[in-house]
Amino acid sequence: MATDVLQAVLDRGADPESLALLSPDSGWTLAGLQVAVHQKAAELKELIEQGQVYPLIVHQDVDSVIDMLALWQLGVTPAPLNPKLTQAELAAAKTALSGVRSEAQAIVWTSGTAGRPRGVEVSFAGLSANAEASAARLLLTDDDVWAASLSFAHVGGLA
């Protein structure tokens, strides 16, 4: 299940020096972001194992993007958690995921409108289809920039 998302983009012919990520503090090319992701993956490699589900508090920032891409590269399933959750909610999510293994690309949490929130496995194909459908509907080109307006803990924020 290991997925090197940036390498897949480059393999499709993207310019390594094209803008991949823009934050208030900096801009990242595909090549620069790939280096940062490889470094993060090397740091995490000894701490986690392929197939593991890894709960991760995510913010809408560069570090969270790098963390998610590094986990995917290692074949680890991130379970992004909203930093606005209470300590009790975060603890419950981490307890529920303890020891869980998955081949999913991510595990995102439902809102709990029909009961208690639960983790839902999301595939890479599903995330890709969502992103491609959004790009097609909005007529996006390689020159456009996408604003990360949804939390990375939300399925729409991952796509």
Predicted regions located by residue number:
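AMP-binding/adenylate-forming domain of the ANL superfamily
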Residues: 1-20, 35-38, 53
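Conserved pre-ATP/AMP-binding loop-to-beta segment of ANL
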Residues: 3-5, 14-17, 97-109, 116, ...
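Conserved AMP-binding/adenylate-forming core of the ANL superfamily
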Residues: 17-47, 61, 86-90
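Conserved AMP-binding/adenylate-forming
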Residues: 26, 42-85, 151
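Conserved AMP-binding A3 loop
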Residues: 29-31, 105-132
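Conserved S/T- and glycine-rich ATP-binding loop of Class I adenylate-forming
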Residues: 54, 71, 110-113, 146
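Conserved AMP-binding loop of ANL adenylate-forming enzymes
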Residues: 56, 138-159
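Flexible, low-complexity linker/hinge segments
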Residues: 86-104, 131
